[in-house]
Design a protein with these regions (language model features):
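Periplasmic-binding protein-like
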Residues: 63, 109-116, 173-176, 206, ...
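Flexible loop/turn connectors
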Residues: 221-323
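Alpha-helical recognition/docking segments in bacterial nutrient-uptake
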Residues: 57-162, 225, 323
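Hinge/beta->alpha junction and helix N-cap segments in small-molecule ligand-binding domains
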Residues: 31, 66-76, 96-100, 149-159, ...
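N-terminal helix-turn-helix DNA-binding module of bacterial transcription factors
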Residues: 1-57, 182, 322
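Residue-level detector of anion-binding/catalytic polar loops
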Residues: 46, 90-91, 133, 170, ...
């Protein structure tokens, strides 16, 4: 009687590899799998009756690729996603960037919402090439099978900086976040606003952060050691701005009298800190992302990008004339 040892010997592979192929697992190359199946047939081996999970129209699981568990910023997005998904009887599977690729397949899920800036475009495109619906919330990808639901960072940031200029601020410093599309758009708006009003921005006044409060603290420390103290520090997100504000106050500086600070995102704690910021409608962003994905899954949606507006929240960390 022919056994898997015989097949493994003929194919020149391990017994475990043969067992995986015969039981429908796909953790090997197509060439190896086809070779093993051909040898099994040639030797007269009776293949086990297995049930391989195939794509099903009944698959109602959505993958949410989310890795930034250290911040509350994304919680409202997740609430929006879950509220819409559950209203349509879809389940949610939260993945990290390490295992998302495995579950971004119609064997496991019906589609994916990506909120992880560390997830490579190439991985998303690879999944989309297999007619797998994908929504991205942090970037625009030039692919017909990927839809973007993004925030209009530029207009609100530019308006905020221009209002600061009109209120008398002339010396600016900027604290950037990670190298993402959102960060680039916010910085571009900042520079364009200064240029439009004839204000020169010096490289010495540019500080690099990583979205975290600690990087705001570090930037504030460096800024206070500088010989060129700005009138206002514009931060690419709220957590860095909050870190800077706390460090300034710890050092005895008054905010906004000695230095003004503003952020972006309107994090939960920002209103308690009196931080001027740009409010991003994250709940609505998540809700619309889930709605868009379900429509794509069910064949009624469009892959056209969706851009959401944002608005300024003026608070006590800046002295401005808004009328």
């Amino acid at each position: 009687m022919v056994g898997i040892k015989d097949i493994a010997r003929e194919a020149g592979v391990s017994i475990a590899t043969v067992s995986n192929v015969l039981h429908g697992k796909r953790n090997m190359s197509d060439k190896t799998r086809e070779k093993i199946l051909a040898i099994a047939k040639e030797l007269g081996y009776e293949l086990p009756k297995i049930r391989i999970k195939e794509k099903s129209s009944d698959n109602k699981t959505i993958v949410v690729n989310f890795s930034d568990f250290d911040t509350n910023f994304y919680l409202n997005i997740l609430h929006g996603i879950s509220d819409y998904a559950y209203s349509k009887d879809y389940d949610i599977m939260v993945c990290t960037s390490r295992n998302a690729e495995k579950y971004m397949s119609d064997v496991y899920s019906a589609g994916c919402i990506n909120i992880d800036y560390r997830c490579e475009d190439s991985m998303l495109i690879k999944a989309a090439e297999n007619n797998y619906p994908i929504i991205v919330l942090d970037r625009e990808i030039n692919h017909s099978g990927i839809k973007s639901v993004i925030v209009n960072n530029y207009d609100a940031e530019k308006e905020m900086v221009e209002t600061l200029i009109k209120s008398g601020y002339e010396r600016f410093a900027y604290l950037s976040g990670m190298d993402t599309d959102d960060n680039k758009e916010r910085y571009r708006a900042f520079r364009d606003a200064l240029s439009a009003h004839g204000i020169t921005f010096h490289r010495r006044d540019y500080y690099e952060g990583n979205w975290r409060e600690k990087s705001g603290t570090q930037a504030a420390r460096l800024l206070m050691l500088s010989e060129h103290m700005p009138q206002v520090l514009v931060c690419a997100n709220d957590m860095m701005a909050i870190g800077a504000m706390r460090k300034f106050r710890e050092a005895g500086l008054r905010v906004p009298e000695d230095i003004a600070v503003c952020g972006f995102d309107d994090a939960f704690v920002s209103k308690y800190m009196g931080l001027t910021t740009v409010e991003v409608p994250n709940y609505e962003r998540g809700f619309l992302a889930a709605q868009s994905l379900v429509e794509l899954i069910e064949g009624t949606g469009s892959y056209e990008s969706l851009k959401i507006g944002a608005r300024i929240k003026w608070r006590t960390s800046t002295l401005v004339k808004t009328s």
